[in-house]
Design a protein with these regions (language model features):
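Surface-exposed amphipathic alpha-helices with a cationic face
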Residues: 2, 144-148, 179-180, 206-214, ...
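Short glycine/serine/threonine/alanine-rich loop segments
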Residues: 10, 49, 82, 128, ...
């Protein structure tokens, strides 16, 4: 199924996630069978998509938990329980902190800080992710304005845009309204969209990106290397940056496959005039290796974890030697 389909001069890709529930061992009626298969499908998608999962009784417990979390998450939006944390992004050449990525966190009144891996997939499944994205965008822009007023020298604040929100025509209006309301210079805002979101509707994505780019902001492809984008499509996108997925960075510098992929992505990016941003840097050896490959920017626990705006250390510049 990974093979491309050529339809009207466009290359299209399809994939499948499958949830399996068996009659009569898993259920005694069609309604329950479908419900259990849906739980298994959620597990398959959570495991990275493009695979299958079998139903187990444990999934029913997970399904009930998802319903509870989804209900709590709706309340969290209304009760202002969400928080925006910021993870520093460093210039690998100078080690200087030059930007931040805005990341949502949930401060639950009873459970404390809920891990994003626990509620983001549910937010995506229920459609709440678009509303969360919009809120994070507004908060990040206001915060960037405050930093600018305080004299903090930052080149950009990056905000993730989910595939659900990216596919909506009203995204342009949302972004332009937030920029107008906050007064933030559009050049200081970077929107990140995943490679898979762009490939889901390449023509629609291209039009959406050109509209957003016309506002004067920056665009980045997140998790690059995890999808099936063609170079022909990539060169048409009005993006300024490719972000290397942390899954490829984790194996550096010892994994030969990761080394080959990262080296190729960096070379490709530079040949197209794009910046390269590596995520998931947890060791100095990874930072040094990426610097030697001429990667531009780095982000990860070695530089700093996501944290509240008040806790960012603007002077931190860990030395990286070639």
């Amino acid at each position: 199924m990974k093979a491309a389909f050529d339809i009207e001069k466009h290359q299209l890709f399809i994939s499948a996630s499958v949830g399996i529930s068996v009659f009569p061992s898993d259920a005694l009626n069609a309604e329950q069978l479908l419900r259990n298969a849906d739980s298994a499908l959620f597990k398959a998608k959570n495991a990275g998509r493009e695979g299958y999962a079998l139903y187990t009784e444990e999934l029913t417990v997970h399904a009930l938990n998802r319903i509870e979390v989804a209900s709590d998450l709706r309340r969290a939006l209304e009760q202002h329980e969400l928080r925006v944390y910021y993870q520093p992004v460093h210039d690998l050449n100078t080690s200087r902190l030059i930007g931040v990525e805005a990341l949502v966190r949930w401060q639950h009144p009873l459970r404390g800080l809920v891990p994003p891996g626990e509620f983001i997939p549910i937010a995506e499944r229920t459609g709440l992710i678009a509303e969360i994205d919009a809120w994070v965008l507004e908060q990040a822009c206001w915060q960037m304005c405050q930093w600018q007023s305080a004299g903090v020298d930052l080149s950009f604040v990056a905000v993730n845009i989910s595939s659900r929100l990216f596919a909506r025509p009203e995204l342009y209006t949302l972004v332009s309204t937030v920029l107008a309301d906050t007064g933030l210079d559009p050049a200081l805002l970077e929107l990140e969209v995943t490679e898979s979101a762009v490939m889901d509707d390449s023509q629609g994505a291209l039009e959406q990106m050109h509209r957003l780019r016309a506002l004067g902001l920056r665009l980045a492809i997140d998790d690059f290397g995890t999808g099936f984008s063609s170079l022909l499509r990539l060169k048409r996108l009005p993006v300024q940056k490719l972000k290397i997925d942390q899954g490829f960075v984790a194996g550096l510098p010892g994994d030969n496959d990761d080394v080959a992929i990262v080296r190729a992505v960096i070379a490709l990016s530079h040949s197209m005039g794009l910046q390269v941003h590596a995520e998931g840097i947890e060791q100095i050896e990874q930072a040094q290796f990426l610097l030697n490959l001429n990667c531009n920017l780095g982000q990860g626990y070695w530089f700093g974890r996501p944290m509240p705006a008040s806790e960012l250390d603007w002077q931190r510049a860990p030395a990286i030697s070639r």
